[in-house]
Amino acid sequence: MTSISQTTTIAAQATAPGRGGVGIIRVSGPEAKNVAQAILGKLPEVRKAEYLPFLDCTSTDKTQVLDQGIALYFKAPNSFTGEDVIEFQGHGGPVILDMLLKVILAQPKVIMAKPGEFSEQAFLNDKLDLTQAEAIADLINSSSEQAARSALHSLQGDFSKLVNEMVESIIHLRMYVEAAIDFPEEEIDFLADKKIVTDLKAIISRVEDVRKQAQQGSIIREGMRVVIAGRPNAGKSSLLNALSGKQTAIVTDIAGTTRDVLAEQIHIDGMPLHIIDTAGLRDSDDVVEKIGIERAWQEINQADRVLLMVDASEDHSILEDDQDIKDFYPEFFAKLPEKIGLTLIRNKADVNDAKTGFTEFTDTDGTQHAIITLSAKTGKGVDSLKEHLKTIMGYQGGTEGGFMARRRHLVALENTHQHLLTGLDQLESYVAGEILAEELRICQQELDQITGEFTSDDLLGKIFSSFCIGK
């Protein structure tokens, strides 16, 4: 990406609105030096903090003092934005900051910064790539230590490095494939060379690995959608109340009490979860209940995880060695998308004093399933479920963490994965080098969108407009 010259100077408050001990106003652009001369009466030394009065240069004698504080000057290109930057660090009173900002905006060719415009300047001047710019907003908005660590890793370039490595591998393979197409007269059939297939499969494996990491990063950022499903009167609403810590749902002994979707956002050790209670799944002639069941399946199909609840006081056979979980509820598993993870919740452990906690059950085909026995009524065993959900989300209590990812990153990685699989199929089935080369070109374009090497102006506007002003 080439650096884009900025002709406009922007200014905004860089600290949060409201009262505080310190308030910072940032100015970036070619007029920053003139603003410093007008407000400070001098241009501070580069990267040297100076304690100076902030003058109202719009007053009659131009010497009226608005505030006094620290002034910092960063000379282009060695600044956050890549432009000349001056920061005024004064007292954090809203009135004082508004007065100072008004004087700054009165200077020629200085305008109010839009949300995210400082970060956009940094991106356009190659100081940050797009994932790093997004990580700034994610770091500010992080709701847990895990999210903050992941956002910081993205800001430091961990995600970008993985993407760039995949792009380099694809470019290298493209060169090899296109050379084979351009020089068909060579005695060696390069397209039939096992090296191409081997390298292509290695890239596919790498993309799949990064995609899984990105899915974890997306869950940490956006929260995991957990849907509680099961037959009527299994205790789904009681579990929602137990997880949320409040009486969100009405609980009765009457089967079918819940007829619509109930949602509650909770945090477990700072990790965001969207818990969704649904109507009991059964055949029904009741029009309202049927609508509720349809909505339940809509939520199940959009879930990151499904908690399938059963009544442990009634259903014992599902844990026998010769049973499969799918045999227990075949009509449910027949409709459940394979990509959605499932945890079996055996509720009402208090009825027969069953042992609570986490166990694993292995189907006859070797598939392992997580099973948690609990009592939503007494709360016993609910902590085991919370720990299980944390594990699924990739919670790490130490100082390590993955990287932050957004929905658009997942889409680009999924598209890349699908195009690579198409290219592999065309190569193995038809030795179709031209199609493989085109699929590789599309893959490179998809990955370049993640870091911003190839990005539409509309996407940039959408991304940076979600930032706070001053960033």
UniProtKB/Swiss-Prot annotation:
CDD domains: trmE (cd04164), TrmE_N (cd14858). It is found in: Cytoplasm. GTP binds at residues 233-238, 252-258, 277-280, 347-350. GO terms for molecular function: GTP binding; GTPase activity; metal ion binding. (6S)-5-formyl-5,6,7,8-tetrahydrofolate binds at R26, E87, K127, K471. GO terms for biological process: tRNA methylation; tRNA wobble uridine modification. Keywords: Cytoplasm, GTP-binding, Hydrolase, Magnesium, Metal-binding, Nucleotide-binding, Potassium, tRNA processing. Mg(2+) binds at S237, T258. InterPro entries: G_TrmE (IPR031168), GTP-bd (IPR006073), GTP-bd_TrmE_N (IPR018948), GTPase_MnmE (IPR004520), MnmE_dom2 (IPR027368), MnmE_helical (IPR025867), P-loop_NTPase (IPR027417), Small_GTP-bd (IPR005225). It is an enzyme of class 3 (hydrolase). Its EC number is 3.6.-.-. Its cofactor is K(+). GO terms for cellular component: cytosol. Signal peptide: none annotated. Binds 1 potassium ion per subunit. Residues 223-394 form the TrmE-type G domain. K(+) binds at N233, T252, I254, T257. HAMAP family: GTPase_MnmE. Belongs to the TRAFAC class TrmE-Era-EngA-EngB-Septin-like GTPase superfamily. TrmE GTPase family. Exhibits a very high intrinsic GTPase hydrolysis rate. Involved in the addition of a carboxymethylaminomethyl (cmnm) group at the wobble position (U34) of certain tRNAs, forming tRNA-cmnm(5)s(2)U34. Homodimer. Heterotetramer of two MnmE and two MnmG subunits. This is tRNA modification GTPase MnmE. It comes from Colwellia psychrerythraea (strain 34H / ATCC BAA-681).
